[in-house]
């Protein structure tokens, strides 16, 4: 007789564990429990973490037996609580074909184990559906590898330290748990007002792990504009409805001034202190799930991952909605375009509140397992050589920056500060976020060629927040492509006709390359029709990384995604970038922002070109020049105005500078500016990322306040404090009145309820017939609800007339649910309640006298017996009422459904009548003790009939199983339509 072949000889424990997890993962995905998939580990609790009830376990057992070709004892359904328990049971179970099975060698078993492990992780990082998955993947697969080398600016100078992928994830997990303890809900918006620091990375990752949404905003950096800063940031925070603001010590006072201006903001917290509290917090009890992993905090690809507020260079800031799917699509496309990998090294100084810094310089590199050397923007701006020295030190290979950064390096870095510098490792120097100056590209390449920098490494790119980040990227290793076009034809007719070699008046544009993989770009006219090559038009784009719109801003969204650009199902809508461009030889040349272009004498004038010409004048501050147009109604055209900052105060000197600007612009454009206005330094408003606010500059110019001096910082802070105090008092007074009324109502409710329940309970106690007890209770509830001033509206009651036994299935929101249901629907059914409810004073008597069912949630055998009891009642013609969620929480949303009721429907043919409850959660939210007055609505949907199948046993057949899932999904969808809540 051959040796008995068991799984031990066929697979080692690692392979068996991976296979078990694979089977469970497949079942969870089939059940639609996508939120549970990220929680799946060898030690996950099958019921609490993964939501697998008794019937799901029965199905799982059958699948494991098939996968491993063995039989498992029936008791495993009740006794196995984790995948690890199932693995151990499998390793000790005999195979079905033991007589015929051949024992495998240790080598073959090892190969099998490795193959199973490879199969489970073969898709790797590209299987990640959310940023949470990315963080977890890197923590598991690259825990010991350094991800971030952060140089912080502190009071004592610079400090550099590192974070591995594992350390980042661990710190973020603790931060997420602390955020959950502080009441940040899933989907809640948390603002990050932080400088470049360890706290930013940990906090941002922690917010994501908590299932919340980061909202990065820039910290205050100019004391003389603190009032303007407060107005702009409070507008952002109000639009985002943030619940928590994380800041740093030096900005905490300013951050607290914002609180009275933002109604949704509950607290302002020092991020360092929050992280410190998180580190000191006790770990969860053995077997307990961390707070941030409970409820609905797991995210889906379609959930919002980030609100990226545009810097507002042409208008008010708008919150770009970016989902996990949007971000991952862009990050992967960019990585493919620049061939990013773990062998690369990123070097960045970009601000993390800007999309190029947050998404481009960090999250994309996190996805590809790339280490990043990080420094602050201030460190770069004060000493730009530090950026290049970081490339030398870390052997950096990739970086992105706006055009001005490369220009700053050319103008500010002295040879003595970069002796011995080696930039030969730098293979991709991305230049974007603002118009790319071809002269800057050439100057940078020439200036640093002696240090090993190659012109071919330069990559002028195009992107915007509405596309997540990038839209176009040029080919690697080619270098910049500059197109010189005839100025007259381009500015008057919009045709990009190549200029002759000797044309000194030619206008130059830099190619931004071709669309990133899986994305499209088209150039259209005002009617949305595509224009031919070398014809200027409006740049539209589409693809998986394009935003769905602006957060809580429907009007702006309609302009961004016009209704006439909507396409057929399965295709992405075209998005209007707001930029003008032309296409030549398949590459995109961006010419300027639509709102910024000046039309003078029938010619299009591009502000950035005017500003570049004016910057050549001696005495003008570089990067502090704005050109814009003013309507000249008499001439029927626009006047060209140039506003520039200068430190020169003398009238004669200022006049000479203005004359120089006029001459340079006239020579370059062929027409003079109508006005040149010189103003003091610091007058021109800029975005947080250093972009010029042209529209705001224009409005200040028209109001004659552009060069007006700002009040001292202490005056602005005092003013903000005074208005904030008034708002705080007003808000707190109204909140106190509201709270007082709630307390009075709560006390009134308890008095009324006590006076009602004692006689009602006494009478019900002596009624022996459960139907009569139900009718009496429904009548008595009319009195209670009238006294409570809580109206109950019922819709769809006609569906109760459906003949035969029925299963009523409702969402579960609070302990209060049963009362309005008995009032609104009567009690022509038996409730199925958890055992804990039956033990409550008075309530237990009602349940017993009216013949309702109770079950023990913690006992799988009890749940299976309950399913059998349900079927027996239904076959007798009695209807039942179930809460398929099995429990409720304080959090809004429809939780996953247990399958017991749906199995009963399939086995007996009884229809499901979905019942939607709305208002009961607000009346008595879990975790609160005082009810709040509200209206309750009960909506019944048409009955859902099970389709005939072949099974009728406790172990569903394949057709039964799929019918259970269909019934469950149809019921959830019907309930969510009228409940006012979303699916979790």
How should these model regions be labeled?
Residues 143-146, 283-309, 315-316, 330, ...:
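Conserved pre-ATP/AMP-binding loop-to-beta segment of ANL
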Residues 1, 392, 399, 543, ...:
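AMP-binding/adenylate-forming catalytic core of the ANL superfamily
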Residues 148-202, 222-229, 319-328:
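Conserved AMP-binding/adenylate-forming core of the ANL superfamily
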Residues 396-400, 412-506, 520, 528-529:
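Gly/Ser/Thr-rich phosphate-binding loop
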């Amino acid at each position: 007789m051959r040796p008995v072949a068991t799984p031990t000889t066929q697979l080692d424990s690692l392979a068996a564990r991976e296979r078990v997890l694979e089977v469970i993962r497949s079942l969870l995905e089939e059940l639609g429990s996508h939120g549970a998939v990220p929680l799946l580990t060898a030690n996950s609790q099958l019921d609490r973490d993964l939501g697998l009830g008794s019937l799901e376990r029965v199905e799982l057992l059958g699948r494991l037996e098939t996968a491993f070709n063995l039989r498992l004892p029936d008791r495993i359904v009740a006794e196995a609580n984790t995948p690890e328990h199932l693995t151990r049971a499998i390793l000790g179970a005999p195979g079905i074909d033991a007589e015929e099975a051949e024992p495998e060698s240790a080598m073959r078993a090892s190969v099998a184990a490795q193959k199973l492990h490879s199969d489970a992780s073969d898709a790797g990082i590209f299987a990640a559906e959310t940023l949470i998955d990315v963080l977890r993947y890197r923590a598991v697969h690259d825990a010991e590898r350094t991800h971030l080398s952060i140089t912080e600016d502190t009071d004592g100078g610079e400090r550099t330290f590192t974070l591995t992928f594992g350390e980042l994830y661990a710190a973020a997990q603790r931060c997420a748990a602390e955020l959950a303890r502080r009441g940040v809900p899933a989907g809640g918006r948390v603002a990050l007002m932080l400088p470049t620091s360890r706290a930013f990375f940990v906090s941002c990752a922690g917010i994501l792990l908590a299932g919340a949404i980061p909202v990065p905003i820039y910290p205050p950096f100019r004391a003389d504009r603190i009032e303007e800063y407060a107005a702009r940031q409070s507008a952002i925070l109000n639009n985002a409805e943030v619940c928590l603001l994380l800041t740093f010590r030096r900005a905490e006072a300013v951050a607290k001034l914002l609180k009275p201006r933002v109604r949704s903001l509950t607290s302002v917290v020092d991020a360092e202190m929050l992280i410190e509290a998180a580190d000191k917090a006790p770990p969860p009890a053995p077997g307990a799930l961390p707070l941030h992993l409970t409820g609905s905090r797991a995210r889906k690809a379609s959930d919002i991952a980030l609100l990226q507020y545009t810097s507002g260079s042409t208008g008010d800031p708008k919150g770009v909605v970016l989902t996990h799917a949007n971000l991952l699509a862009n990050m992967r496309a960019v990585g493919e375009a620049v061939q990013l990998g773990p062998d690369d090294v990123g070097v960045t100084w970009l601000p993390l509140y800007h999309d190029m810094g947050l998404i481009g310089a960090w999250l994309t590199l996190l996805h590809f397992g790339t280490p990043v050397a990080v420094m602050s923007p201030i460190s770069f701006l004060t000493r730009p050589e530090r950026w290049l020295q970081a490339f030398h030190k870390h052997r950096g290979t990739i970086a992105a920056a706006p055009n001005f950064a490369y220009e700053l390096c050319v103008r500010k870095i002295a040879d003595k500060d970069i002796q011995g510098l080696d930039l030969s490792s730098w293979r991709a120097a991305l230049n974007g976020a603002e118009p790319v100056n071809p002269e800057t590209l050439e100057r940078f390449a020439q200036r640093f060629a002696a240090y090993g920098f190659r012109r071919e490494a330069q990559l002028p790119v195009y992107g915007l927040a509405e596309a997540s980040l990038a839209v176009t990227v040029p080919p690697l290793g080619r270098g910049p492509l500059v197109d010189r076009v005839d100025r007259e034809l381009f500015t008057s007719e919009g045709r990009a006709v190549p200029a002759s070699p000797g044309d000194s008046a030619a206008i130059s544009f830099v190619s931004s390359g071709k669309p990133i993989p899986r994305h499209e770009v088209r150039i259209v006219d005002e009617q949305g029709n595509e224009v031919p090559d070398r014809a200027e038009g409006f740049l539209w784009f589409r693809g998986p990384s394009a935003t769905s719109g602006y957060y809580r801003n429907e009007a702006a969204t309609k302009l961004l995604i016009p209704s006439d650009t909507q396409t057929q199902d399965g295709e992405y809508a075209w998005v209007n970038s707001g930029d003008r461009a032309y296409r030549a030889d398949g590459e995109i040349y961006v010419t300027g922002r639509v709102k910024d272009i000046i039309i003078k004498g029938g010619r299009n004038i591009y502000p950035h070109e005017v500003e570049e010409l004016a910057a050549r004048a001696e005495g003008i501050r570089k990067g502090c020049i704005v050109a814009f147009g003013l309507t000249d109604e008499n001439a029927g055209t626009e006047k060209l105005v140039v506003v520039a900052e200068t430190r020169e105060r003398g009238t004669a000197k200022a006049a000479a500078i203005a004359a120089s600007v006029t001459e340079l612009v006239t020579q370059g454009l062929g027409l003079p500016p109508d006005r040149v206005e010189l103003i003091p330094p610091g007058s021109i408003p800029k975005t947080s990322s250093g972009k010029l606010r042209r529209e705001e500059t224009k409005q200040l110019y028209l109001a004659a306040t552009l060069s007006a001096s700002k009040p001292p910082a202490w005056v602005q802070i005092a003013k903000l404090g005074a208005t904030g105090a008034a708002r705080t008092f007003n808000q707190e007074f109204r909140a106190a009145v509201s709270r007082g009324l709630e307390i009075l109502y709560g006390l009134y409710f308890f008095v009324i309820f006590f006076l009602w329940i004692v006689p009602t309970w006494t009478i019900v106690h002596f009624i022996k017939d459960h139907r009569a007890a139900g009718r009496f209770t429904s009548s008595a509830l009319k009195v209670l609800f009238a006294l409570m001033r809580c109206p109950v509206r019922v819709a769809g009651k006609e569906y109760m007339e459906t003949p035969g036994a029925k299963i009523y299935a409702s969402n579960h929101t609070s302990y209060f649910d049963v009362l309005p249901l008995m009032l609104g629907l009567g009690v022509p059914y038996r409730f199925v309640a958890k055992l804990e409810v039956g033990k409550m004073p008075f309530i237990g008597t009602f349940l017993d006298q009216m013949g309702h069912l109770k079950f023990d949630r913690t006992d799988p055998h009890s749940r299976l017996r309950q399913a059998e009891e349900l079927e027996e009642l239904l076959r007798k013609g009695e209807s039942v009422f179930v809460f398929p969620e099995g429990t409720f929480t304080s959090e809004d949303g429809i939780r996953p459904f247990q399958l017991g009721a749906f199995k009963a429907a399939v086995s007996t043919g009884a229809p499901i009548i979905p019942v939607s409850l709305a208002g009961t959660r607000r009346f008595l939210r879990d975790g609160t003790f005082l009810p709040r007055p509200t209206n309750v609505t009960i909506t019944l949907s048409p009955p859902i009939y099970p389709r005939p199948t072949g099974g009728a046993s406790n172990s569903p057949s394949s057709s039964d199983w799929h019918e259970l899932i269909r019934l469950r999904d149809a019921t959830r969808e019907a309930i969510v339509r009228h409940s006012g809540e979303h699916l979790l």
